[in-house]
Amino acid sequence: MTTPLALGLSGIRRSCLNTVMAAGLLVFTACGGGEPALETPSPETTADVAPVIIPIEGLEKTDLTFGFIKLTDMAPLAIAYEKGYFEEEGLFVTLEPQANWKVLLDRVIDGELDGAHMLAGQPLAATIGYGTEAHIVTPFSMDLNGNGITVSNEVWEEMKPGIPKMDDGRPVHPIGAEYLKPVIEKYTEEGKPFNMGMVFPVSTHNYELRYWLAAGGVHPGFYSPDDVSGQIQAEALLSVTPPPQMPATLEAGTIYGYCVGEPWNQQAVFKGIGVPVITDYEIWKDNPEKVFGITAEFAEENPKTTKALTRALIRAAMWLDENENANRPEAVEILSRSEYVGADYEVIANSMTGTFEYEKGDKRPVPDFNVFFRYNATYPYYSDAVWYLSQMRRWGQISETQTDEWYDEVARRVYRPDIYLDAARSLVDDGLASEADFPWDTDGYRPPQTEFLDDVTFDGRAPNAYIDSLTIGLKSGEIVSGGEVTN
């Protein structure tokens, strides 16, 4: 059972908002514990006054509850609340942390949550009926990058001798899984299954961990319709562990490594129990991460509310990245609060402010480890959806070959750039964003992407050719049956 945070708007703040909605051109001079004082601005002061935001008329639903998991990439939700962006859009929001990704998805489907911070694979998997079936859509991508892969100290010590060193003795990065492969083989020979953690079967973390392992010659296993463990033919055995539990599970020896979002890789460094060996930025530069998910029914029944919440989230993402991340220290302070991520300020800052610490003391600049708005991070690209679907097919979650057209059709059912651009256009019209901030002319597909760890090119318009180009994984016409891959 989840406990709602004390994040609903107070009566005073709601009263202030109602005054704005009614007054239009009036400007607040106070809006605190006492009565709000209002005065008409003089011509000399209007140039310095921020635009007054008039909420969209006729919002279908204004009292909303959104869910999240305690990870730093939930930041757009926290900032939209703390900076008053939801409020200014006429939305009275409560934020609730969820126990795990399954609970979060189920509560959105059941209507207990109006929307949530989601794994990008969740709306896609639900819509095609892998796991819980429901039509989920996303009008907003929450971020790029933000994950890492950590191994235990013991595993790191066995990997380390084979890794090339720089002149100062530190390891050369990125570190591929080929340096982990002999360790896995040794453990297997000793009768110790090499267990690793990821956060959910359709998570970016699962696919990134699998991508890294496969690029290094380690088989991460297949799924099949009658075996959803994902461990068919696996050399490394991947299983689900909720993000906040990753460090403790590693420390207990239940797993030897994991892939997770922050701050749970940096937590392992601070606790002295593990070493992050690679970030997802190094696996796939500027990869899409989380999305904001709502049911298709919610979007259809509440189009104005959906536009308003998308506006608020875009504004939050802009704030997080503006002035070369100048607001990140404040964002870290907000996220460190118990009602959000609840980790120490220093742990969150270690990755959120443009650095990343690998081995203890080996802190390196990674300015784009977390990206919330730059590089069109918030635009829901169809090609991002296609990549996730390609990985579901690669590992057998999509059991049979599908046409390239099928991938495009699913992407268009789930990813809603039309909603996003409508919200963005209104922000530009209101003077809250610049025309140049948004990709107005895109067809929803990024150009072919080349910056992967294994130098394979991904073209979202040709998913089957991409899948067939990958060394380990299912190819066209192949299925997994009875623990074997057949044509």
What positions do the PLM features span?
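Conserved C-terminal helix/tail region of periplasmic/extracytoplasmic solute-binding proteins
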Residues: 386-487
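Bacterial signal peptide processing site
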Residues: 32-35
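Short glycine- and hydrophobic/aromatic-rich loop-to-beta-strand nucleating segment
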Residues: 149-150, 291-294, 298-299
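Bacterial N-terminal signal peptides that target proteins for export
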Residues: 2-20
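C-terminal motif of bacterial Sec signal peptides marking the signal peptidase cleavage site
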Residues: 27-30
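Short, glycine-/small- and polar/acidic-enriched structural segments
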Residues: 39-239, 251-286
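Secondary-structure end/capping motifs
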Residues: 300-418
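Soluble non-cytosolic domains of exported or imported proteins
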Residues: 71, 98-102, 117, 200-203, ...
